[in-house]
């Protein structure tokens, strides 16, 4: 009787360890899938910035004519003034 109780407890402990390891592996694969789906590549550093690209107002590198670095939004935006 005592031996069967010990085997049952050992079996339940083993089952919980296996379930926990399986859950960790599943969570790892879920995190991998989510990181692949929501992976956003950083724009390459270029000397010339396009419309709505992030910029630095103190070092305006917006390319096209009429594009200026907005001090408010810090993005290359059209400038219709002088």
Curated annotation (Swiss-Prot):
Keyword entries, A-Z: Amidation, Antibiotic, Antimicrobial, Disulfide bond, Ion channel impairing toxin, Knottin, Lipid-binding, Neurotoxin, Potassium channel impairing toxin, Secreted, Signal, Toxin, Voltage-gated potassium channel impairing toxin, Voltage-gated sodium channel impairing toxin
The main location class comes to secreted
Which GO biological-process labels does this protein carry? defense response to bacterium
Q: Which GO terms describe its cellular component?
A: extracellular region
A GO molecular function held by the record: potassium channel regulator activity
Pfam families for this protein: Toxin_12
Q: List the disulfide bonds.
A: 48-63, 55-69, 62-76
* Residue list for modification Phenylalanine amide: 80
Quick check: keyword Signal in the entry? yes
Tissue specificity, in the record's words, reads: Expressed by the venom gland.
Propeptide regions on this chain: 22-46
Entry similarity comment = Belongs to the neurotoxin 10 (Hwtx-1) family. 52 (MTx4) subfamily.
In its miscellaneous comment, the UniProt entry states: Negative results: this toxin does not inhibit potassium channels Kv1.1/KCNA1, Kv1.4/KCNA4 and Kv11.3/KCNH7 (IC(50)=53->85 uM).
This protein's domain notes: The presence of a 'disulfide through disulfide knot' structurally defines this protein as a knottin.
User: What's this protein's name?
Assistant: M-theraphotoxin-Gr1a
Which species is listed as the source? Answer: Grammostola rosea (Chilean rose tarantula)
